[in-house]
Amino acid sequence: MPRKGHVQKREILPDPMYNSKLVTSLIDHLMIDGKRGTATKILYAAFDEIKNETGNDPVEVFQQAMENVMPVLEVKARRVGGSNYQVPIEVRPDRRTTLGLRWIVQYARLRGEHTMVERLAREIIDASNNTGASVKKREDTHRMAEANRAFAHYRW
């Protein structure tokens, strides 16, 4: 944590093909070992597959998937009097986006399809239809927050 003021957030430039900052962030989350070109190829191929399969604009399908995956509440461990409580807190907008992207990529990697292109396309389509592992993760997170609502007064 810096002692001199606030750290400036890095400006995310919009993606050249779809002109979307969210797509750029997805490329960043897909990227492994700094291989942006590979991540970009995978994403664009997945978007082509989404367009072929659904017939809709892939960016709109992706945005719908993000809306269905982004959590509103999460739990955070808080130590009070020698015991840890899972305290439900609201998720900040930037963290909501980050968690949504992270979960989509994480659960796409765990899927059974042969290529990452197919896995990512299927996970985004499933998430836009409110099914799939990433949506289940959001529901589990919300369920955990709801179960620990009694500890909400420990919020800080």
From Swiss-Prot:
Alphabetical list of PROSITE patterns matching this protein: RIBOSOMAL_S7
Pfam family, one: Ribosomal_S7
GO MF: rRNA binding; structural constituent of ribosome; tRNA binding
A GO term from the CC aspect: small ribosomal subunit
Disulfide links within the chain: none
CDD domains membership: uS7_Bacteria
Presence of the UniProt keyword S-adenosyl-L-methionine in the record: no
Entry keywords, A to Z: Ribonucleoprotein, Ribosomal protein, RNA-binding, rRNA-binding, tRNA-binding
Domain of life the protein comes from: Bacteria
A GO BP entry: translation
Function recorded in the entry: One of the primary rRNA binding proteins, it binds directly to 16S rRNA where it nucleates assembly of the head domain of the 30S subunit. Is located at the subunit interface close to the decoding center, probably blocks exit of the E-site tRNA.
NCBIfam families: rpsG_bact
Assembly with partners or alone: Part of the 30S ribosomal subunit. Contacts proteins S9 and S11.
Protein family: Belongs to the universal ribosomal protein uS7 family.
Protein name: Small ribosomal subunit protein uS7
Name of the gene this protein is made from: rpsG
